[in-house]
């Protein structure tokens, strides 16, 4: 099966070093990029193209690895994480406004919060599904994960715990689903027994991915699953949205040149893992040409983008009874 991806549109970012991340906001009207040049740049996107001069945000003292937009219901807010071990929260406040504790106003953006509890590079950040509230999860080379819950009074509740002994490289939230009493269907339960579950997956330098859930009674994060399968560092992990789809899917990308799809058809079943096959299917070779750095799902959760160290991006879909198939690829 084949499919045509739209032609890539280049963006002249004016970054002075390697670009590590690029993220569109919820509406697709703004593009944020970050780089080893220690800056973040924000572009307006008009008809699919970045227009005008970017806003340049400075403050990190080392490479900026990732940026992440909050849901617009919380305002125009962007988080960034860096090799300097810090996480910044930026807010658009408009020219001539802003008086938070974070620092000076930069082109209408203000650094309103700074998270400094990690002792090594913060490699990945992710905002929770919006119905869980303004919650940011962070994964660090110090082996710990921190979860920042922003309160209405402006304070931050921080929960930090060890996740991967040799370093946490990536983090991704599960889609928001309602918790249910075991053995009772959702339709049979009173409405007050339902609450959105907090759950995410992490990837580590211990070659593992781990699934964590929040225990509402004990008010702490607990490990629910450990999934093996990779033979080297797991560079990225992505939990698929499940809009109209049965079951759950998690994709993981590794230094071992493989991508694994971990699936669970129902809450009562076990996780199973299967590799993508970038070579001819009959060869059954799961290895990409180089280390795989990023995986990202489409909004509907039915297409997976894979970014490889050879500079190519491939798009994958699950075929009917045929496993996962590459439907398009292009050079980045």
Curated annotation (Swiss-Prot):
What are the entry keywords? Cytoplasmic vesicle, Endoplasmic reticulum, ER-Golgi transport, Membrane, mRNA transport, Nuclear pore complex, Nucleus, Protein transport, Repeat, Translocation, Transport, WD repeat
Return the PROSITE patterns for the record.
Answer: WD_REPEATS_2, WD_REPEATS_REGION
Molecular-function GO terms, alphabetical: structural molecule activity
Q: Which SMART domains match?
A: WD40 (SM00320)
Q: Which GO terms describe its cellular component?
A: COPII vesicle coat; endoplasmic reticulum membrane; nuclear pore outer ring
Q: Which Pfam families match?
A: WD40
Q: Where are the WD repeats?
A: 14-53, 59-100, 117-158, 163-222, 229-272, 287-326
The protein's location, in the record's own words, is: Cytoplasmic vesicle, COPII-coated vesicle membrane; Endoplasmic reticulum membrane; Nucleus, Nuclear pore complex
Q: Which InterPro entries does the entry mention?
A: Sec13/Seh1_fam, WD40/YVTN_repeat-like_dom_sf, WD40_repeat_dom_sf, WD40_rpt
Entry membrane topology: Peripheral membrane protein
- Biological process per Gene Ontology, one example term: mRNA transport
Its assembly, as annotated, is: The COPII coat is composed of at least 5 proteins: the SEC23/24 complex, the SEC13/31 complex, and the protein SAR1. Component of the nuclear pore complex (NPC). NPC constitutes the exclusive means of nucleocytoplasmic transport. NPCs allow the passive diffusion of ions and small molecules and the active, nuclear transport receptor-mediated bidirectional transport of macromolecules such as proteins, RNAs, ribonucleoparticles (RNPs), and ribosomal subunits across the nuclear envelope. Due to its 8-fold rotational symmetry, all subunits are present with 8 copies or multiples thereof.
Q: What does this protein do?
A: Component of the coat protein complex II (COPII) which promotes the formation of transport vesicles from the endoplasmic reticulum (ER). The coat has two main functions, the physical deformation of the endoplasmic reticulum membrane into vesicles and the selection of cargo molecules. It also functions as a component of the nuclear pore complex (NPC). NPC components, collectively referred to as nucleoporins (NUPs), can play the role of both NPC structural components and of docking or interaction partners for transiently associated nuclear transport factors.
Tell me its family: Belongs to the WD repeat SEC13 family.
Tell me the protein's name: Protein transport protein SEC13
Q: Which organism is it from?
A: Cryptococcus neoformans var. neoformans serotype D (strain JEC21 / ATCC MYA-565)
Its ancestry begins with: Eukaryota, Fungi, Dikarya, Basidiomycota, Agaricomycotina
């Amino acid at each position: 099966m084949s499919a045509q991806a739209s032609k890539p549109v280049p963006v002249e970012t004016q970054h002075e070093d390697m670009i590590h991340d690029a993220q569109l906001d919820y509406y697709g009207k703004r593009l944020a990029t970050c780089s080893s040049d220690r800056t973040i740049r924000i572009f307006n996107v008009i008809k699919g193209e970045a227009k005008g001069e970017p806003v340049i945000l400075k403050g990190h003292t080392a490479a900026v690895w990732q940026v992440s937009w909050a849901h617009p219901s919380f305002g125009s807010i962007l988080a960034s994480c860096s090799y300097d071990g810090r996480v910044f929260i930026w807010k658009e406040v408009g020219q001539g406004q802003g008086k938070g504790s974070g620092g000076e106003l930069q082109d209408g953006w203000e650094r309103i919060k700074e998270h400094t509890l990690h002792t090594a590079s913060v490699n990945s950040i992710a905002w929770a599904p919006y119905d869980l509230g303004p919650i940011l999860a962070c994964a660090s080379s110090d082996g710990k994960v921190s979860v920042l819950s922003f309160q209405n009074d402006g304070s931050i509740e921080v929960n930090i715990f060890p996740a991967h002994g040799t370093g946490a490289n990536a983090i991704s939230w599960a889609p928001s689903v309602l918790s249910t009493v075991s053995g009772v269907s959702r339709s049979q339960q009173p409405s007050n027994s339902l609450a959105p579950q907090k759950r995410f997956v992490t990837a580590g330098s211990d070659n593992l991915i781990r699934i964590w859930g929040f225990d509402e009674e004990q008010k702490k994060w607990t490990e629910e699953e450990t999934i093996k399968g990779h033979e080297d560092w797991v560079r990225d992990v992505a939990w698929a949205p499940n809009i109209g789809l049965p079951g759950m899917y998690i994709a993981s990308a590794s230094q071992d040149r493989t991508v694994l799809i971990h699936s669970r058809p129902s809450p009562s079943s076990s996780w199973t893992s299967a590799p993508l096959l970038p070579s001819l299917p009959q060869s059954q070779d799961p290895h990409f040409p180089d280390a795989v750095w990023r995986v990202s799902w489409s909004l509907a959760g039915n297409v997976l983008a894979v970014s490889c160290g050879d500079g190519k991006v491939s798009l994958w879909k699950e075929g009917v009874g045929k496993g996962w198939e590459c439907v398009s690829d292009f050079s980045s």
